Each structure stands twice: as structure tokens, then as C-alpha cells.
Amino acid sequence: MTLPIACSLTDAALQERRRDVLQKFRNAVIETRESKDGYSYQLPPTEEWLTELANLMNLERQCCPFLRLSITVEPNNGPFWLELTGPPGTKEFLTTTFN
């Protein structure tokens, strides 16, 4: 079964929350790295951002079930990286949604 490359949120409150979280995310991104199947985003290594990333990942798995999401926490208080990848079409979706 192929999942569509589209947001599937229908509840207005969830959509609004996602917009708020995404705006905060965009403002906090330190660096973006392109990969074959998506992007990785570097974020500040704070407790607040670890919580925000978990929040964002939860919203995205409800909204975009085609996404593969992972967080890398670098050692020695290094940065956090959120990696988003998926099937063909994912990069284009991420470019319009996250970048």
C-alpha cells in the first residue's frame, strides 16, 4: 500500500497547533542538510527543544503517516538533529512545509 504524500489532519485545532509548532521550528533551525530522501534539521540542544521535537514528531505522525522521523542527540551537549525522510515526493513536500 502506498501512502499519499499529503497532510491528513482534519481537526482544526490540530491543524492550528501544527502551524504554531512548525513556525517555532522554522525559526529555531540552525542548519538544514539535504539527503537523498529528505532533510535533516539542526536545532538548539536545549531541554525545551527536545520536548518540542517530541511534540512535532507526534503531530507529524498523525498528519503525515508517510514520513520517517528520527532525532539524533549529539554527545557532549551537541546539537539535536531531526531527520525527516520518506518515499519519492517527500523532499518536495518537506520543501513547501518545513523549509
Question: What residues fall within each predicted segment?
Answer:
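An N-terminal amphipathic alpha-helical segment
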Residues: 6-35
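Accessory DNA-engaging acidic/polar modules
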Residues: 28-34, 90, 97-99
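A short linear hydrophobic-aromatic micro-motif
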Residues: 29-30, 66-71
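Short, ordered beta-strand-loop transition motifs
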Residues: 32-38, 72-76
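Short beta-strand-to-loop capping motifs
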Residues: 42-47, 82-86
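Short, conserved charged micro-motifs
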Residues: 48-54, 89-94
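Short, compact, well-ordered microdomains
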Residues: 69-98
